[in-house]
From Swiss-Prot:
Keywords: Lipoyl. It comes from Chlamydia trachomatis serovar L2 (strain ATCC VR-902B / DSM 19102 / 434/Bu). Residues 21-103 form the Lipoyl-binding domain. Its cofactor is (R)-lipoate. This is Glycine cleavage system H-like protein. One of its GO terms (cellular component) is cytosol. The keyword Glycosyltransferase does not apply.
Length: 117
C-alpha cells in the first residue's frame, strides 16, 4: 500500500504513508484539464479538513477551482514550497507537486478509490 497512489472522484491522488497518514495532490489528468496553474491557497497545519470539503483553491490560466478532499483529517504538513514556486504543480503534479499530509480520522480504505486517475 505504501508508495501506491489511489485516485478519488475529486481528481485528487492519495498516497498512504501509514494506516492513518496520507499525502494528497492533484491528479495529472485534472492538472492538464485546468491548464497552467498560477497560484494555490493551501490550508494551515493543524486545521481539520472534512471529506467533500475544500482542500485548497487553485487558480489556473482557465479558472479558479476549489479542490475537494476525498478524506477527513488533520493537516500535519503543507507543501509550503508551492507558495513561492508553483512549477512543481505544473511539471511534477504527482510527485513534488503534492499539497498536504493528513492524519486521517480512521484507517485508509483503498477499496473506496481507483488505481487509475
Amino acid at each position: 500500500m505504501k508508495g501506491q497512489k489511489y485516485y478519488s472522484d475529486y481528481h485528487v491522488w492519495i498516497e498512504p504513508i501509514h494506516s492513518r497518514i496520507v499525502k494528497l495532490g492533484l491528479s495529472s489528468q485534472m492538472r492538464e484539464h485546468l491548464g497552467n496553474i498560477l497560484h494555490i491557497d493551501l490550508p494551515s497545519v493543524g486545521s481539520f479538513i472534512k471529506e467533500g470539503e475544500e482542500l485548497c483553491i487553485l487558480e489556473s490560466s482557465k479558472s479558479a477551482i476549489e479542490v475537494l478532499s476525498p478524506v477527513s483529517g488533520e493537516v500535519l504538513e503543507v507543501n509550503t514550497a508551492l507558495e513561492d514556486d508553483i512549477l512543481p504543480v505544473n511539471n511534477a503534479t504527482e510527485s513534488e507537486g503534492w499539497f498536504v499530509v493528513l492524519q486521517l480520522t480512521e484507517d485508509f480504505r483503498s477499496e473506496s478509490f481507483s488505481l487509475e486517475p
